[in-house]
């Protein structure tokens, strides 16, 4: 049979398909390589953080800290840059969603200076009521808390690290209530709190997860295995939001 004019042979179609598959595979390989480089970059930052061990006051007793918590603040173009010179990012793991009933079992506080992560304090806390399925699903194990201090024994050390004035940054600001419930003061006079999930809200009104926020802003999703990784990821997302809102890159280039 002769070839019908205008139609392509099966061989030509196969060649085109093969070329398309190779092109797509090349793009996928490039994307994977980029994601791998981004993950390695993220892990290297995490390794380079200066780690602070909390002082443990054995036998210290405590009780819930009373008083209202600060409401989340907006991030605006006129937010004074000097107010963000130092801020602290908090990432928590708990035994449930209710501060009045559930307990804090792990905390990481990561201090940023001039939008660079510097120092991190991480501590596991022994829950009085024991671990729950909720905590285990979040990655907390019995071995992490078996010999951990009680919240009251590390409260003073955590409070000292947080200070009284530096803004606090959380992915979900309502989690801040777990600190005073555990006897850890965090609501100093004039304390500013930023809710990163709200600040990264999507146009459709859906609240992104931390992993989704990272993917949307950085085109990669870091491995969020513990509170240290979560605090770093949350802090980097917040820095990106500050850059977008306050035009930090342009201001730096203009100097």
What residue spans do the PLM features occupy?
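Conserved non-catalytic scaffold segment of RNase H-like nuclease domains
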Residues: 69, 74-188, 211-222
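Short glycine/threonine-rich catalytic loop with a Thr-x-Gly-x-Asp
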Residues: 206, 224-229
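Cysteine endopeptidase catalytic domains of the caspase/legumain-like
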Residues: 220-225, 254-255
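Active-site catalytic microenvironments for nucleophilic, acid-base chemistry
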Residues: 182, 216, 237-244
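Acidic, divalent-metal-coordinating active-site segment for phosphoryl/phosphodiester hydrolysis
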Residues: 229-239
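Short alpha-helix plus adjacent loop in nuclease-associated cores
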Residues: 193-212
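Mixed-charge, glycine-rich, non-catalytic linkers/tails in nucleic-acid processing enzymes
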Residues: 242-255
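N-terminal accessory regions of nucleic-acid-interacting proteins
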Residues: 6-9, 15-88
């Amino acid at each position: 049979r002769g070839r019908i004019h205008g139609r392509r042979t099966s061989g030509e179609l196969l060649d085109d398909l093969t070329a398309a598959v190779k092109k797509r595979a090349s793009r996928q390989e490039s994307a994977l390589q980029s994601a791998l480089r981004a993950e390695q970059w993220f892990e290297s930052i995490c390794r380079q953080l200066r780690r602070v061990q909390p002082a443990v006051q054995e036998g210290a007793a405590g009780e819930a800290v009373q008083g209202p918590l600060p409401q989340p603040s907006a991030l605006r173009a006129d937010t004074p840059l000097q107010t963000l010179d130092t801020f602290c990012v908090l990432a928590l793991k708990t035994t449930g969603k209710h501060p009045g009933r559930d307990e804090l079992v792990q905390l990481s506080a990561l201090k940023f200076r001039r939008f660079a992560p510097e120092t991190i304090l991480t501590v596991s806390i022994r829950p009085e009521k024991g671990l729950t399925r909720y905590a285990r699903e979040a990655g907390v194990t019995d071995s992490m808390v078996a010999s951990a201090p009680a919240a009251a024994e590390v409260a003073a050390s955590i409070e000292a690290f947080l200070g009284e004035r530096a803004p606090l940054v959380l992915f979900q600001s309502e989690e801040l209530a777990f600190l005073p419930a555990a006897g850890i003061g965090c609501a100093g006079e004039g304390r500013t709190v930023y809710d990163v999930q709200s600040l990264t809200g999507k146009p459709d009104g859906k609240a992104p997860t931390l992993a989704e926020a990272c993917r949307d802003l950085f085109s990669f999703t870091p491995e969020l295995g513990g509170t240290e990784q979560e605090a770093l990821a949350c802090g980097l997302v917040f820095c990106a939001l500050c850059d977008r809102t306050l035009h930090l890159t342009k201001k730096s280039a203009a100097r």
